[in-house]
């Protein structure tokens, strides 16, 4: 008998069900089920993916939802238990009207009814029931509640739904009955009783519902409330539930684990995808409940029409005065308007200077004719493809943003290849000059719509989105939902935490997963250590097994960083919407690909902070010099800019801040804008290997060769190296007579590795090339090179547009360094680490950072003749409104003359005593009196007197004193306290740092600054330039001490937050050193430390080996520090090694130093290796094992043969092991190596 599952959950029932769409549909196919329903909790998140997967597998998809229905009104949100906030109800789409109504219902559930859950109510059901089939629901339904109350209540509830849905209402029965063997698997008596209670309730409800349904003539269906695929998935599902709840599924007790009674748990283990035979057996006494499911499926006939678009239209002003017009007239008017905009912009965008560059490329033609030809060609493609509306909608958004002072980027993606977009102001880089192709943007050989991605100033993005909402209607615009999934490492950590596994052990497993793109199964295949751990350790195996089940599960929802959907009419006519978590932001329920596939227009509006920085800098420059700069009109041959790049001073330059980019800039020494474009395209995995050759060819150190003379003009600007995707298109055209459109099809095929199409293209390319007189063998060689290149080739249009941003930031830094760094400091004012780097960069350029000043500072950092003035907006606790009132008063009535004048002129409703005190402690009033304690003491009496004076003046009361005061400006009498508390310099600086995030006017280290050179101190900013294993001397202030207990050894250790005046970082102090030098670990203490730098992993790890209090510095202290440094440096040099038999330098992945501590006096660890049995493979395994246990103990290798010691070696290259070697010893035994530990 055929059974159709009608009540099924996927992982889109977030952290409640674990079935992936793919596995769910595959299981249905395995069972030979002709139709499947998806009914996730309260949403349609997975509907499109489910539909596509089903149709691909030949299964009828039924789109549905298990809705939450409020017991009363959806607007009633009284504080009551979560379990009472809503009942459950299944709704299935019969047809398109049903789908539309389900979209509306699930949308309103979020936007109007959300309370614990997205809820609808009976009022909404009355309005939007057409086209829907309703099932009564599970034990959490209102029908089940009524069945447990009384027969009368049940009849009333059923009649309400029957009256509404008529023949499309079905009651639902479920029975999650377990076998006796399975019941015996319950370890807890309370859970067993919960199970019996569940079954008792289900039987009671089923009996009542069947009887009442029969009486009312309502058909009944059997469902199983599927939450996972296989019967043995119940444990992984329980873990998933408690990832959500935050509970552990078990708790430690003595030396074992017991189940956690507080955990979230299903009372039966039968919520899996059962076969039709199993369901038929379960309901063998009432077979009609099985057959009725097929009847439901037959009634459902909804299909998505993926060919239909629901794009908005653009109505030109010329039509808005007309009473009526046809769609054809409207589109024609849009096309005319588009062309009109382009033609009007032609003289402005194509100035004589821009045309001169085009003339250089085409010396025998009028450049304006070339531009017009290109424009006409683009229009001839865009208009017939129906894309005018799209371009005008994007133009409208960008035009509004620019008109309202919101900076917009020069372009992003392939759109920069369009002359039309350049004329419309959508992009700002002229494409003909830089060989950027329209066909890379819109391919005339293909029907697909292009993407126009827009970068917008971060600060103005929300305003732009609000404009789109206002322009197109709030019901027609939404942002796009995203789904965060459990990657392998996250799955391991979630499972480990939920199983209450030791954190160190969880981290040990997780560290074997190298990156976000590596799956757990791949890691098991490729990492022998992880595989051994899985085989030999039961607890680790359990974590890995459960993580394998949960990997890929949806963990949370979010909002797409850029995507905005604009619909031609109300969104809910086509898709469901929701409200993003913890906000009022409307988002689609479908993620990016599904939402586009159902015909929604996506516009990418990406907030780019660099544009904000550019805008702030250019505004400051104009205010100072009167010169108005614009990205599009900067000279692209500025010598000062290129000189800056030659020096590698790329800090603060867009996409060039990394050390690798600094080196590339220094070595390449770019002197053309085209080379900046190439740098951005080259510095990526893949093409990065070509960088040395690119540099050498530029500087004449390597011969530039071309496979064919026709390729020279194409590859000349990149020194004979293929860098851009557009070059593939050009080569195909030059050698094989491809049109640019055909070349783009070839590029796509290569990029997608479509082997079938590639063979067709290979044959086509070689045949055409041969027809053009090219040797067949050479044609094949060139095609192979193109194919290999296409795997990493970059979009030149995008590289050029972003290259312009890079150049602009370099230009500003080179020519207006104070204004540029001030802008960067403003935009990064909430990032203390970035502030430190920028301050260090400013100081390296001879630009001082000045403390905040009440008469100079504003919300932003400000460039002045003397340096960069610290921003009031970066002072903790000082809000924008207060700053605006201070600056406005200052601008209107002149500088403040004293603290008294400031308070007198301030709106005391906005300016509190506390905020004035913060401004004083931040240094804003040092210009009036450097004694901050005296200024603080004056605030209370001044504030009270002036406030009283203002109050009396406002009420019209004039005392004898205030009358006189009106003629004597700012002389309201005050009385200062006799004993003004005086803080130490250390306390003053500590308060300043608390407010500014950094020490600014002075630093506690200034007391030892003169001794730093004698101590050979290296500050944190230089750490990244030093090699792995470096032993460094440094000085810092302890800002914060956090004491912790190591999970394994149960010993105290500390994590220090330290700073050296510019940079701050964390420094772990492990147990042994903590015990020895605990008394030094106090906040605000000045410390000299000897550190070892570990750069074996992607991030820098720092090990502290010695510390000394520097509150007093004398010759003896300096001598002691020097001696300690020499001693530790010698120890570290002895501890490093190279595996001589491997012939390669060890480059192990770094591991966090052992919690048990680093000291300089620990005994070495000696390993004995038997040469009679030793193999190279043994050494490789030994190397891996040793690398996994780094620490501070010297490692000595003793080689024996025939029980005789024949050689020994001490490691070099910073190689040493942890103090507690028990794990190391055990791992050596497990690995079955001819190695034994002979001394510890």
Curated annotation (Swiss-Prot):
The keyword Cytoplasm applies. DNA polymerase III is a complex, multichain enzyme responsible for most of the replicative synthesis in bacteria. This DNA polymerase also exhibits 3' to 5' exonuclease activity. The alpha chain is the DNA polymerase. Pfam families: DNA_pol3_alpha, DNA_pol3_finger, HHH_6, PHP. This is DNA polymerase III subunit alpha. One of its GO terms (molecular function) is 3'-5' exonuclease activity. It is found in: Cytoplasm. DNA polymerase III contains a core (composed of alpha, epsilon and theta chains) that associates with a tau subunit. This core dimerizes to form the PolIII' complex. PolIII' associates with the gamma complex (composed of gamma, delta, delta', psi and chi chains) and with the beta chain to form the complete DNA polymerase III complex. It comes from the Bacteria. Its EC number is 2.7.7.7. Keywords: Cytoplasm, DNA replication, DNA-directed DNA polymerase, Nucleotidyltransferase, Transferase. One of its GO terms (biological process) is DNA replication. It comes from Chlamydia pneumoniae (Chlamydophila pneumoniae). Transmembrane segments: none annotated. It catalyses: DNA(n) + a 2'-deoxyribonucleoside 5'-triphosphate = DNA(n+1) + diphosphate. GO terms for cellular component: cytoplasm. Belongs to the DNA polymerase type-C family. DnaE subfamily.
């Amino acid at each position: 008998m055929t059974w159709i599952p009608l009540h099924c959950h996927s992982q889109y029932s977030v952290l409640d069900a674990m079935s992936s769409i793919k596995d769910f549909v595959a299981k249905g196919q395995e069972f030979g089920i002709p139709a499947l329903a998806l009914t996730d909790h309260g949403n349609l998140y997975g509907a499109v993916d489910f539909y596509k997967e089903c149709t691909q597998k030949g299964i009828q998809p039924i789109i549905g939802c298990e809705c939450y229905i409020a017991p009363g009104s959806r607007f009633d949100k009284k504080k009551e238990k979560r379990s009472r906030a809503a009942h459950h109800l299944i709704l299935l789409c019969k047809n398109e009207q049903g789908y539309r109504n389900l979209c509306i219902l699930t949308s309103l559930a979020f936007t109007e009814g959300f309370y614990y859950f997205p809820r609808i109510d009976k009022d909404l059901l009355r309005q939007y029931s057409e086209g829907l089939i309703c099932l009564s629901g599970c034990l959490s339904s209102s029908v089940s509640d009524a069945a447990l109350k009384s027969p009368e209540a049940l009849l009333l509830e059923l009649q309400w739904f029957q009256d509404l849905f008529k023949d499309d209402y079905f009651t639902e029965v479920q029975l999650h009955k377990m076998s006796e063997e399975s019941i015996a698997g319950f370890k807890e008596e309370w859970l067993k009783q919960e199970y019996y209670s569940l079954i008792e309730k289900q039987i009671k409800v089923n009996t009542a519902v069947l009887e009442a349904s029969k009486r009312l003539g309502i058909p009944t269906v059997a469902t199983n409330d599927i939450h996972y695929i296989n019967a043995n998935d119940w444990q992984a599902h329980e873990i998933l539930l408690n990832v959500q709840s935050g509970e552990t599924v078990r708790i430690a007790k003595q030396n074992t684990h017991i189940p956690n009674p507080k955990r979230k748990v299903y009372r039966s283990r039968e919520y899996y995808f059962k076969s039709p035979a199993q369901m038929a057996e379960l309901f063998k006494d009432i077979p009609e409940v099985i057959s009725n499911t097929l009847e439901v499926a037959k009634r459902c006939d909804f299909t998505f029409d993926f060919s239909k678009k629901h794009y908005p239209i653009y109505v030109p002003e010329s039509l808005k005065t007309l009473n009526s017009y046809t769609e054809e007239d409207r589109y024609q008017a849009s096309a005319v308007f588009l062309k009109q905009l382009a033609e009007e912009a032609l003289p402005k965008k194509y100035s004589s200077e821009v045309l001169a560059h085009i003339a250089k490329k085409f010396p025998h033609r009028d450049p304006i004719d070339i531009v017009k030809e290109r424009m006409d060609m683009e229009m001839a493609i865009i208009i017939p493809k129906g894309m005018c509306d799209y371009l005008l909608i994007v133009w409208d958004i960008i035009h509004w943003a620019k008109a309202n002072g919101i900076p917009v980027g020069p372009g992003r993606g392939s759109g920069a290849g369009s002359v039309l977009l350049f004329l419309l102001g959508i992009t700002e880089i002229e494409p003909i000059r830089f060989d950027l192709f329209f066909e890379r943007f819109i391919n005339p050989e293909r029907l697909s719509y292009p993407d126009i991605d827009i970068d917008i100033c971060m600060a103005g993005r929300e305003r732009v989105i609000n404009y789109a909402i206002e322009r197109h209607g709030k019901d027609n615009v939404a942002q796009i939902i995203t789904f965060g999934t459990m990657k392998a490492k996250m799955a391991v950590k979630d499972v480990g935490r939920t199983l209450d596994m030791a954190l160190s052990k969880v981290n040990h497993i997780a560290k074997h997963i190298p990156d976000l793109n590596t799956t757990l199964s791949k890691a098991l295949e490729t990492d022998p250590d992880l595989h051994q751990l899985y085989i030999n350790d039961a607890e680790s195996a359990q974590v890995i097994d459960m993580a394998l089940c949960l990997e890929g599960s949806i963990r949370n929802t979010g909002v797409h960083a850029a995507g905005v959907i604009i619909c031609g009419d109300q969104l809910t006519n086509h898709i469901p919407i929701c409200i993003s978590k913890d906000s009022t932001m409307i988002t689609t329920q479908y993620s990016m690909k599904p939402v586009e596939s159902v015909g929604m227009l996506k516009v990418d509006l990406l907030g780019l902070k660099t544009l904000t920085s550019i805008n702030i800098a250019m505004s400051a420059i104009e205010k100072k010099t009167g010169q108005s700069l614009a990205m599009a009109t900067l000279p692209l041959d500025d010598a000062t800019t290129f000189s800056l790049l030659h020096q590698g001073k790329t800090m603060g330059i867009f996409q060039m801040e990394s050390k690798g980019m600094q080196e590339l800039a220094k070595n390449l020494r770019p002197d053309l804008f085209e080379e900046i474009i190439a740098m951005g395209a080259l510095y990526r995995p893949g093409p990065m290997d070509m960088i040395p050759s690119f540099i050498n060819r530029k500087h004449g150190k390597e011969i530039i060769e071309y496979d064919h003379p026709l390729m020279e003009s194409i590859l000349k600007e990149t020194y004979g190296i293929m860098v851009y995707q557009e070059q593939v298109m050009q080569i195909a055209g030059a050698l094989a007579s491809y049109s640019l459109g055909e070349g783009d099809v070839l590029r796509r095929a290569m990029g997608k590795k479509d082997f079938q199409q590639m063979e067709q293209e290979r044959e086509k390319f070689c045949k055409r090339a041969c027809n053009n007189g090219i040797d067949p063998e050479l044609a094949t060689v060139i095609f192979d090179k193109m194919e290999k290149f296409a795997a990493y080739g970059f979009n030149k249009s995008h590289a050029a547009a972003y290259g312009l941003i890079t150049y602009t930031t370099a230009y500003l830094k080179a020519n207006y360094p104070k204004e540029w760094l001030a802008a960067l400091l403003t935009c990064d004012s909430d990032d203390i680490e970035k502030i430190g780097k920028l301050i260090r960069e400013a100081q390296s350029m001879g630009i001082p950072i000045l403390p905040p000043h009440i008469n100079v500072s504003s919300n932003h950092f400000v460039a002045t003749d003397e340096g960069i003035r610290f921003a009031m907006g970066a002072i903790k606790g000082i809000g924008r409104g207060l700053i605006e009132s201070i600056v406005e008063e200052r601008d209107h009535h002149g500088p403040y003359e004293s603290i008294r004048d400031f308070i007198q002129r301030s709106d005391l409703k906005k300016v509190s005593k506390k905020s004035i005190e913060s401004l004083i402690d931040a240094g804003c009033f040092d210009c009036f009196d450097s004694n901050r304690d005296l200024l603080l003491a004056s605030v209370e009496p001044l504030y009270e007197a002036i406030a009283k004076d203002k109050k009396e003046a406002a009420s019209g009361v004039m005392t004898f004193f205030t009358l006189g005061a009106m003629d004597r400006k700012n002389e309201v009498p005050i009385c200062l306290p006799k004993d003004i508390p005086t803080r130490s310099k250390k306390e003053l600086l500590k308060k300043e740092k608390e407010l500014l995030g950094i020490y600014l006017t002075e630093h506690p280290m200034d007391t030892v600054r003169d001794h730093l050179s004698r101590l050979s101190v290296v500050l944190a900013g230089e750490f990244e330039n030093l090699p792995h294993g470096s032993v460094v001397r440094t000085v810092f202030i302890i800002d914060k001490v956090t004491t912790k207990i190591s999970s394994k050894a149960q010993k105290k250790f500390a994590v220090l937050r330290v700073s050296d005046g510019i940079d701050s970082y964390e420094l772990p102090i492990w147990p042994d050193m903590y015990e020895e030098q605990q008394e030094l670990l106090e906040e605000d203490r000045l410390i000299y430390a000897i550190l070892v730098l570990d750069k074996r992993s992607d991030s820098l790890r720092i090990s502290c080996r010695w510390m000394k209090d520097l509150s007093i510095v004398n010759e003896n202290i300096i001598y002691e520090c020097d001696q300690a440094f020499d001693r530790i440096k010698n120890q570290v040099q002895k501890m490093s090694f190279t595996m001589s038999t491997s012939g390669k330098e060890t480059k192990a992945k770094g591991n966090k130093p052992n919690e048990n501590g680093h000291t300089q006096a620990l005994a070495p660890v000696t390993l004995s290796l038997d040469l009679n049995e030793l193999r190279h493979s043994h050494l490789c395994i030994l190397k891996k094992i040793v690398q996994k246990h780094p620490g501070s103990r010297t490692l000595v290798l003793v080689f024996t043969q025939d029980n005789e010691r024949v050689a020994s070696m001490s490691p070099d290259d910073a190689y040493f092991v942890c103090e507690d070697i028990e794990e190391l010893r055990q791992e050596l035994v497990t690995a079955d190596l001819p190695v034994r530990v002979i001394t510890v």
